[in-house]
Amino acid sequence: MGRFSEDSADEPDEREMSAALTVGEGDIDASLRPRSLGEFIGQPRVREQLQLVLEGAKNRGGTPDHILLSGPPGLGKTSLAMIIAAELGSSLRVTSGPALERAGDLAAMLSNLVEHDVLFIDEIHRIARPAEEMLYLAMEDFRVDVVVGKGPGATSIPLEVAPFTLVGATTRSGALTGPLRDRFGFTAHMDFYEPSELERVLARSAGILGIELGAEAGAEIARRSRGTPRIANRLLRRVRDYAEVRADGVITRDIAKYALEVYDVDELGLDRLDRAVLSALTRSFGGGPVGVSTLAVAVGEEATTVEEVCEPFLVRAGMIARTPRGRVATAQAWTHLGMKPPANAVGLGQTGLFD
């Protein structure tokens, strides 16, 4: 694939059920990455669209339009960026939005690109404004204006940039400014995985890692993985530890269930903190409504952790509803905790994500 440079600012997260990379997980995660669109599991619509974009560019002998990959963490945006470069036979340069604090940081990176290179900017919604404004011109006209000097004597020197393809990844497409978003010729929206797709991901990972994984065990892990391949692979490694230490190393369905109970991952993929949030919401606040800051204090966590890590899955799973007055526990949340929902519980008589 040629040159590879990484300057990513992934912030480690220690929770088993967080879709963010954990400390020391990067190398393992990289070993499991697919190397081509053919190896990439899931996201069939995105794969088809990308194949057309890339094949069209190769047939013309040019560079593809700039590509934006949008979706929750852990779904394979970084893997797709690497695949894009590999499919084009191009070199890949990797950085992240938070790492580009000044326009000069970006100018230095752009000036080192050669024709047909792929520049991947992770968390592109967090790029500093001066760097973002420089990126506009680079994306459109393949040049940048570098300001030399200060004050009235400052001069702008135009520098040519080799034709390249920018691949941006974001978990918050709404946080992108309009001018930046409009400069991407193609946007891929990535969705959570179906359990059957995660079973295929797990089977592939087990083969690479030399793990003996039964089909029923794979299904058990998949349905607790929040629709996220990164979480599925992490749970696979934790279950492997359990199987090797407390059994014969073979992962059966029962072994998977016992292991996930040890790691506090329940049958719906909720972990200790998720259940603590639901417990506080139902037992301490009568089901709500309650503000996220108050809820965070009740469980001893930062409000941003509850809002950005726990809440999205709990809302998607039908456990919590957002209202103008605050968060409310649904009937499914009460039932999941083994309690009878009140008569006025949100969603009473309706089915949730896992029903």
UniProtKB/Swiss-Prot annotation:
Native organism taxonomy: Bacteria, Bacillati, Actinomycetota, Actinomycetes, Mycobacteriales
Domain notes: Has 3 domains, the large (RuvB-L) and small ATPase (RuvB-S) domains and the C-terminal head (RuvB-H) domain. The head domain binds DNA, while the ATPase domains jointly bind ATP, ADP or are empty depending on the state of the subunit in the translocation cycle. During a single DNA translocation step the structure of each domain remains the same, but their relative positions change.
Assembly and interaction partners: Homohexamer. Forms an RuvA(8)-RuvB(12)-Holliday junction (HJ) complex. HJ DNA is sandwiched between 2 RuvA tetramers; dsDNA enters through RuvA and exits via RuvB. An RuvB hexamer assembles on each DNA strand where it exits the tetramer. Each RuvB hexamer is contacted by two RuvA subunits (via domain III) on 2 adjacent RuvB subunits; this complex drives branch migration. In the full resolvosome a probable DNA-RuvA(4)-RuvB(12)-RuvC(2) complex forms which resolves the HJ.
Primary location group: cytoplasm
Region (Large ATPase domain (RuvB-L)): 1-193
The protein, known as: Holliday junction branch migration complex subunit RuvB
Binding-site positions, ATP: L32, R33, G74, K77, T78, S79, E140, D141, F142, R183, Y193, R230
Localisation per UniProt entry: Cytoplasm
Recorded GO MF terms: ATP binding; ATP hydrolysis activity; four-way junction DNA binding; four-way junction helicase activity
Annotated binding of DNA, by residue: R322, R327
